[in-house]
Amino acid sequence: MDPGTLRNRLRGIVDPRGKGQVNSTSLPADPATVPGDELAPGHSTGSRTGSTLEHVLGGEWRSRDQGRSFVVRRRIDPDTAYGRTRVGEFGSRLSEAQDGASLLATGGPRGPFLFFDLETTGLSGGAGTHAFLVGCAWFDADGAFLTEQHLMTDYGAERGMLSVVAEDLAQAGALVTFNGKSFDAPVIETRYLFHRLSSPCSQIPHVDVLHPARRFWGADPVLGCSLVALERQLLGARRVGDVPGFEIPARYFQFVRTGDAQPLADVFEHNRLDLLSLAGLTARLLALVTTGPASTHDEREALALGRVYERAGDPRAEAAYERAIELADAALQRGGQKRRNEADWMSTPQGVRIEALRALALTLRRARRFGDAAVRWRQLVDFPNCPQQIRRESTEALAIHHEHRERDLAAAKMFALKSLEVGPETAWGDAVRHRLARIERKLKVSERPLFPSSPSQPSCGSPTSGHRTSS
């Protein structure tokens, strides 16, 4: 393409009068890459966007000392179906199980829960990333789901938007996000810091449901552990016509450049669905950790629940691990040992059974129930296809148990030798050989007679004992 043609095309893209607009999918994903007269920070779109925003999105302006913000408020009725569940049921579960939040996060999270999700100008985070749409949601007393979405109408409106968002955050007993500890919270805190405003996020207990969701339900082989994948799997919800995440920044840049809010309508709907799915997923998690092991549907859920309890010091961890073993055994009897690939192996019933046995043995040992722990270690040693590292750990634990607690040196020697067979490498092998040498010394001592007879002293009652016999 010759320079003249390229120059004309670029002028068409950035024409402030709206000529030569391009499709949103062809827009660059970063405003810094747009040539021409992109709106600079502090340049307000003013009345050019006001009527369009209110007409397309149906929101309102809120003015504060720091500036004003455009807010779109929606109410989703409790009887509205979302996937297999009604919205009001999410609120009821959260209300009944809110104490379970303390098992998933530190800082004493409590209700009311504020569900929080950002749409940003980039996916990399950092100081140059702006949160142009801040979604906040909660359940009201009637079980309806309320959403407030705050739009940064241009870069100069960010300070006003942040001041209004802070009012929502100040009312929260806990902040609930999906990957928010790694992305949403750092992004919004950076923007508060940039404007020299106090960040309310740092003062609120934060429940990030991504990490427990990974433990409980794993990753879909195609969709991974995204919110969309989990809402399909757990809530039965499917989105129709949803805007792809990679396209969202480009739609915002088009709005800033042209003042046309129509491309943002789908972005707002995408954000609302994210908030609703986040609420449904949180309700499912809290109900699970509150009701206990009996409510788990499969061995993976039970194992993850045991780890949540163990991390929180909850005594129900033992029952959860027992439940995981029970469900894994049932799945193995049904022929559920197949796996998609090696990385996925520990998610199979066989892999979960091994992990649950190991976790249970460690839990019992910490409770000083050494005999019960030894039973679980022995089950691991005898289990076919047990990973080498876990088998080695189990044989070593059994050698220690029989040497120091059962005082069965022969059994201790046997398990030490088994441990050496599993892992003879230098670091491990040296420790095992040291243990074997000690056991051998103890065995030699135990084989000596307690009161050995002296050759110079005949035994009592012999003819040469010095006593005459009567004739």
Regions from the PLM with identified roles:
Residues M1-R110, L305:
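N-terminal accessory regions of nucleic-acid-interacting proteins
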Residues D142-L234:
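Conserved DEDDh/DEDDy metal-dependent 3′-5′ exonuclease domain
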Residues V222, S226-T296:
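Acidic, Mg2+-coordinating catalytic module of metal-dependent nucleases/exonucleases
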Residues Y309, L364, H402-E403, E440:
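Residue at a conserved register position within TPR or TPR-like alpha-solenoid repeats
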